[in-house]
């Protein structure tokens, strides 16, 4: 491979690596906060977020089928989708904590860990079952909001997507607020 080519793509690879690193930071932040409160690692942490994402996608699909995506401003649609996803994720997390984790707080440390792995498997299969029954296909192409797919060209060889900017800004804000508050 040519050295000039490597030097030319290095800034883009660096930006993509930083974005991925900030995604890992968000995941680690979530695990750390859950561990700090519950004092065990919740392996169902990501599945709870996936439920929120699927709720958002289902709302987005409902808006699309009703023709509302052309009428309602995208900022309002995004706000509705995010609030609904967060509300459902929060409710699912509370139910899981009260039914699967709280009764095991005084048990040996391995028992809640096994429970967390079981909850993770249960939620994965429940999501898979719901989506396959509801949509007849788990691998369905979902509509996206054009604003999230937009890319800003910084130079000829470097561009950044709105999704990457959202991840970076969210991670920086959350890490800063955790550090200072």
Language model segments and positions:
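Small-residue-rich transmembrane alpha-helical segments that form helix-helix packing/gating elements
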Residues: 1-38, 44-181
């Amino acid at each position: 491979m040519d050295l000039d080519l490597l030097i030319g793509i290095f800034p883009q690879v660096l930006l993509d690596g930083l974005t991925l690193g900030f995604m890992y930071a968000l995941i680690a932040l979530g695990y750390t906060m859950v561990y700090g409160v519950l004092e065990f690692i919740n392996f169902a942490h990501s599945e709870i977020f996936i439920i929120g994402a699927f709720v958002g996608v289902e709302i987005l699909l409902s808006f699309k089928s009703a023709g509302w995506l052309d009428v309602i401003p995208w900022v309002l649609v995004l706000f509705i989708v995010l609030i609904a996803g967060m509300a459902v994720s929060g409710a699912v997390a509370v139910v899981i904590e009260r039914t699967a984790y709280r009764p095991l707080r005084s048990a040996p440390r391995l028992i809640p860990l096994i429970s967390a792995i079981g909850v993770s498997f249960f939620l994965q299969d429940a999501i898979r079952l719901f989506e396959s029954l509801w949509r007849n296909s788990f691998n369905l192409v979902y509509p996206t909001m054009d604003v999230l797919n937009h890319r800003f060209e910084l130079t000829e060889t470097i561009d950044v997507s709105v999704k990457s900017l959202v991840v970076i800004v969210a991670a920086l804000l959350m890490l800063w607020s955790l550090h200072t508050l």
